C-alpha cells in the first residue's frame, strides 16, 4: 500500500480516511471493531473492504454470526475460498474469491526427485485447535511404530496431552527458511485439518513441491489441493491415500511442480480492488 503511494493508518481517529480495510470485525487493541468502522462509513461516506479470513468454524460460533452480519454492510468482500463464502451464506455480487498464496521462500528448495526409500510424510501447524487434525496425527504416530515403510515429520504446535513418540518433531519457529527446507526434504504433505477458510499450510507444502493427502472436510483445502493429491475421510483412507500417491508419485509430483502461486500475485489483486474503491 505504501509502495503504491498511499498513506496507511491503523486507527479511525483521523477524519480523512478514504478507505477502510477490515480483516477482522472483532475489537482491536484500541477497542475499535466493525461497528466503529460502520459508524465512520455512515458519517464520512468511506467505503469498507472486508476480507473474511476466519469464519469461526474452529469453535467460534459467535464470530460466524458476526461475520454473517457485517458482510451485509461492507462495500466489497474478499473471501479466501468459495467454501468460506458458502459457509457465511453470502449471496451478494460484490465479492471476489482470492485464494491465499505462499511466500516466495517456500518455492526455493523444491526437489524434482522421486520418493525417498522410506516414504517421508510431513505437516506443520501453529494452532493447537483439535480441528487441525491431531487425533489422526496421533494415530499416525502410533502406526509408524510398526510400519517402517513410512516416516512422519511434524513441525509446530502439538497439544500437550499427547506428544509424538515415533515421529520427527520440531517446535514452532518463525524461520521460514528452516520450515521450507524441512518440508522440501519430504515426499508427501499431509493435512488432517478440517473446515479451514483459507489454509496456508497446504499452499506452503505445495510450493515446496509436495503432493498433498488431505481431509475431504478441509473446507478450502480440497479447493486448493484437488489437482495435486488425494482426499480422505478416515484414518484408513488416509493411509490408503499416502500409498496411492506413493505408487503414482511421478504423476502427482509433476502436477504439483506446476503450482507457482506466490503472495505478490494475491497482493497485486488486492491493490487493484483497493484502487478501484478508493478512486
Where are these regions (language model features)?
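Donor nucleotide-sugar binding/catalytic pocket of nucleotide-sugar-dependent glycosyltransferases
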Residues: 75-109
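Aromatic "clamp/platform" in nucleotide-sugar-dependent glycosyltransferases that forms part
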Residues: 194-195
Amino acid at each position: 500500500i505504501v509502495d503504491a503511494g498511499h498513506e496507511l493508518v491503523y486507527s479511525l481517529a483521523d477524519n480523512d480516511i478514504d478507505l477502510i480495510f477490515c480483516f477482522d470485525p472483532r475489537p482491536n487493541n484500541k477497542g475499535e471493531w466493525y461497528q466503529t468502522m460502520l459508524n465512520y462509513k455512515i458519517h464520512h461516506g468511506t467505503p469498507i473492504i472486508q476480507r473474511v479470513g476466519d469464519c469461526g468454524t474452529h469453535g467460534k460460533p459467535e464470530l460466524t454470526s458476526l461475520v454473517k452480519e457485517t458482510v451485509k454492510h461492507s462495500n466489497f468482500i474478499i473471501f479466501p475460498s468459495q467454501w468460506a463464502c458458502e459457509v457465511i451464506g453470502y449471496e451478494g455480487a460484490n465479492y471476489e474469491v482470492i485464494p491465499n498464496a505462499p511466500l516466495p521462500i517456500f518455492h526455493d528448495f523444491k526437489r524434482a526427485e522421486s520418493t525417498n526409500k522410506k516414504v517421508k510424510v510431513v505437516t506443520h501447524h501453529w494452532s493447537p485447535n483439535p480441528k487441525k487434525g491431531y487425533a489422526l496425527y496421533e494415530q499416525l504416530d502410533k502406526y509408524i511404530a510398526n510400519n517402517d515403510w513410512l516416516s512422519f515429520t511434524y513441525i509446530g504446535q502439538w497439544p500437550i496431552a499427547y506428544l509424538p513418540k515415533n515421529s520427527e518433531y520440531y517446535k514452532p519457529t518463525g524461520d521460514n527458511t528452516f520450515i521450507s527446507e524441512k518440508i522440501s526434504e519430504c515426499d508427501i504433505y499431509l493435512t488432517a485439518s478440517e473446515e479451514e477458510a483459507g489454509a496456508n499450510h497446504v499452499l506452503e507444502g505445495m510450493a515446496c513441491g509436495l503432493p498433498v493427502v488431505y481431509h475431504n472436510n478441509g473446507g478450502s483445502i480440497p479447493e486448493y489441493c484437488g489437482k495435486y493429491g488425494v482426499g480422505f475421510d478416515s484414518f484408513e483412507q488416509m493411509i490408503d491415500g499416502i500409498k496411492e500417491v506413493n505408487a503414482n508419485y511421478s504423476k502427482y509430483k509433476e502436477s504439483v511442480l506446476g503450482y507457482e502461486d506466490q503472495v505478490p500475485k494475491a497482493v497485486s489483486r488486492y491493490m487493484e480492488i483497493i484502487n478501484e474503491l478508493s478512486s
